[in-house]
Amino acid sequence: MLTHLDSQGRANMVDVTDKAVTSREAVAEAVVRMLPTTLQMIVSGGHPKGDVFAVARIAGIQAAKKTSDLIPLCHPLMLTSIKVHLAADGDDAVRITASCKLAGQTGVEMEALTAASIAALTIYDMCKAVDRGMVIESVRLLEKLGGKSGHFIADQAQVSS
């Protein structure tokens, strides 16, 4: 059953009033593939626009806080922790991991996914002048803790088709 639809099939924000406040956490990732020369420029600090990782990290943090403004049926949340980690992955990619936490009545999966996605888009924006062929891939939820549905770990779950 899709929880965002009412009995007539209309989009609706889920009522979480009676849900218990519990600790909730989610971790998401995104990967940006690029030319090795582009990655080298980022890692060496030689990008003319400045520190790509620092700007992407701040963009991801800001995005997590704005998720309910971007995704219509997401609840506005008082996140208690947002972390965005960026690192070179091989010689042609940046792997972004974003985690969000709160004590609340609804999960933070969308906030973590939004943080990872916007950090990836920020890397693309900052580097597009030197590498228009970059590819953003593997945006996914890695882990979710808390709430009624329990603990989810991506590599231990069946992939939806």
From Swiss-Prot:
The active site is at 125. GO terms for molecular function: cyclic pyranopterin monophosphate synthase activity. Disulfide bonds: none annotated. InterPro entries: MoaC (IPR023045), MoaC_bact/euk (IPR047594), MoaC_sf (IPR036522), MoCo_biosynth_MoaA/MoaC (IPR050105), Mopterin_CF_biosynth-C_dom (IPR002820). Its EC number is 4.6.1.17. Pathway: Cofactor biosynthesis; molybdopterin biosynthesis. The keyword Transmembrane does not apply. It comes from the Bacteria. Substrate binds at residues 73-75, 110-111. Keywords: Lyase, Molybdenum cofactor biosynthesis. It is an enzyme of class 4 (lyase). GO terms for biological process: Mo-molybdopterin cofactor biosynthetic process. SUPFAM superfamilies: Molybdenum cofactor biosynthesis protein C, MoaC. It catalyses: (8S)-3',8-cyclo-7,8-dihydroguanosine 5'-triphosphate = cyclic pyranopterin phosphate + diphosphate. PANTHER family: CYCLIC PYRANOPTERIN MONOPHOSPHATE SYNTHASE (PTHR22960:SF29), MOLYBDOPTERIN COFACTOR SYNTHESIS PROTEIN A (PTHR22960). Homohexamer; trimer of dimers. NCBIfam families: moaC (TIGR00581), PRK09364.1 (NF006870). Belongs to the MoaC family. Catalyzes the conversion of (8S)-3',8-cyclo-7,8-dihydroguanosine 5'-triphosphate to cyclic pyranopterin monophosphate (cPMP). This is Cyclic pyranopterin monophosphate synthase. It comes from Pseudomonas savastanoi pv. phaseolicola (strain 1448A / Race 6).
